[in-house]
Amino acid sequence: MRRRRAAVAAGFCASFLLGSVLNVLFAPGSEPPRPGQSPEPSPAPGPGRRGGRGELARQIRARYEEVQRYSRGGPGPGAGRPERRRLMDLAPGGPGLPRPRPPWARPLSDGAPGWPPAPGPGSPGPGPRLGCAALRNVSGAQYMGSGYTKAVYRVRLPGGAAVALKAVDFSGHDLGSCVREFGVRRGCYRLAAHKLLKEMVLLERLRHPNVLQLYGYCYQDSEDIPDTLTTITELGAPVEMIQLLQTSWEDRFRICLSLGRLLHHLAHSPLGSVTLLDFRPRQFVLVDGELKVTDLDDARVEETPCAGSTDCILEFPARNFTLPCSAQGWCEGMNEKRNLYNAYRFFFTYLLPHSAPPSLRPLLDSIVNATGELAWGVDETLAQLEKVLHLYRSGQYLQNSTASSSTEYQCIPDSTIPQEDYRCWPSYHHGSCLLSVFNLAEAVDVCESHAQCRAFVVTNQTTWTGRQLVFFKTGWSQVVPDPNKTTYVKASG
């Protein structure tokens, strides 16, 4: 496997450096015909394949229509927009109905998606718009991972910026199972690529600080498949739960707060309430400490239709919930509730309570319990998470919890203690005790609570909440000058 990935990455770089087309092993994508070009006839499926070409065409049409639904509602008509043109050309023609050659039939240029909504309040502006030209001299191609449909690679652009490339995985489950069933490589390629196209549309329509930024896309011919699609996105780090459990509570809370804000946005998105049918940690990435959803090809906007509450059972491995059926014939809040319970079982229950400040634990426990019982919706959940942030950032959580110390500490400005470290948990540094504090009184309180602490060094570095980072030490036998730090040592003991 390691050898295969190395070979894939090597070929990927070589294809770009030579200025040739993207290699299908690394940047596969959709197989829409070029504008004005009729779809090529596919070979008839082999014997025993159920449904045949008609069934495959039905599935392609269903996915195409789904992408069309999500792409509607932009700021203007699709005419003149390159991605909209490409999408229109993807429409499979009906039996015996030839598709007319459009007047703008010519090779399309690459660029940004053609239907970006105006950014709403708090939404990030559009990122740099990249296309095929940006990918011709990339370096450092590295395989990051793959799922059922897509493979992800990390590359460095000529300007030095690192981005992620997503493309249909030729070795993936979706493409392989389709080819085994229908025996039609290009048709199956198109079917799989519509999931990537759907994700591209949703990344643009759902723009938010906790949705991965779409930077652009590229269509290029690749081997025997014309117009393969590669999307170019913001680069994030995979979510590794075991590693997160070893980080500070402040960083873990930031992830949960990010998730709460994301779920609130999905519940009130321009498309309606969006649910993530595949809600595992691997569907998310971390970008500068913020959690962002990256995999949207299994997202769904439509609520579940119902005739009664028996049709509105939300099933999970550990338990089920029955939701009401509205008078309009839809399960009330099923999309929102599914997201919320998944946030509880994959994130909140592990990351929120452990090693939190004692005065915040009752509120954190109530958040975990309420989401685990689906007693709250996303609005109330986010309001409570924002309350925790306010209490923590303002220092109000310290009221009645920081005892006045009888021990005096001597201040030594512009100095530090280079050694005499000890380990504590959780710490921002694995080899020492590096914690964040709201003020000097909290630093003294922490030192007093550690039996081995005899001194601490206040740095000029702060966390995302504005709290200062402090090293706690076992002694002060060697104090050296440092203009960016201040040392405090116990006056006795």
From Swiss-Prot:
Residue ranges of the region described as Disordered: 28-128
Entry comment on modification after translation: N-glycosylated.
Active-site feature positions: D278
GO process annotations (BP): bone mineralization; cell differentiation; embryonic digestive tract development; limb morphogenesis; lung alveolus development; multicellular organism growth; negative regulation of Golgi to plasma membrane protein transport; peptidyl-tyrosine phosphorylation
Residues spanning the signal sequence: 1-32
Record field: compositional bias (Pro residues): 30-46, 95-105, 114-127
Family: Belongs to the protein kinase superfamily.
Protein name, per record: Extracellular tyrosine-protein kinase PKDCC
